[in-house]
Amino acid sequence: MQSLAWQPLAEGAERAVLYGDPTHAGPFVLRFRTSREIAIPLHWHRHDEHITVLSGPFSLAVNGERDELETGSYVVIPAGAHHSTWYGAGTLIQVNGTGPFESIYVDQPH
């Protein structure tokens, strides 16, 4: 077993690839962790996104309905569903999906 190689995403957020390559077709497993509060604006993905909350505060709004998810929670966000996410300091989530994994932001031209 290897230790995770964490890569910075934004100030206070990091990502590690556990399995696969999210930039190519096929299954992948990622982990995201935060050291401060972070909000990800409204976006969607071309494939289903499976999220497991491993620790810390995490909330999710899918198609306008916001839910606070507790440690151990699991949710599937269907492909094409518009959603926003909020991470508290110390949050750790795992994302399973099928690549290529791309976030398409609603307020940006694509």
Which residues does each PLM region occupy?
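A short, N-terminal "cap"/entry segment at the start of jelly-roll beta-barrel domains
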Residues: 1-26, 108-110
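Glycine- and acidic-residue-biased ligand/ion/polar-headgroup-sensing regions
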Residues: 35-38, 45-63
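Conserved short histidine dyad/triad with adjacent acidic residue
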Residues: 25-45, 78-80
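A short, compositionally biased micro-patch
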Residues: 21, 33-35, 53, 78, ...
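Short acidic-glycine-tyrosine-enriched beta hairpin
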Residues: 37, 58, 63-82
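Double-stranded beta-helix
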Residues: 7, 86-110
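Extracytoplasmic
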Residues: 13, 25-27, 46-48, 88
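Conserved hydrophobic/aromatic beta-strand scaffold that supports enzyme active sites
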Residues: 17, 29-31, 50, 66, ...
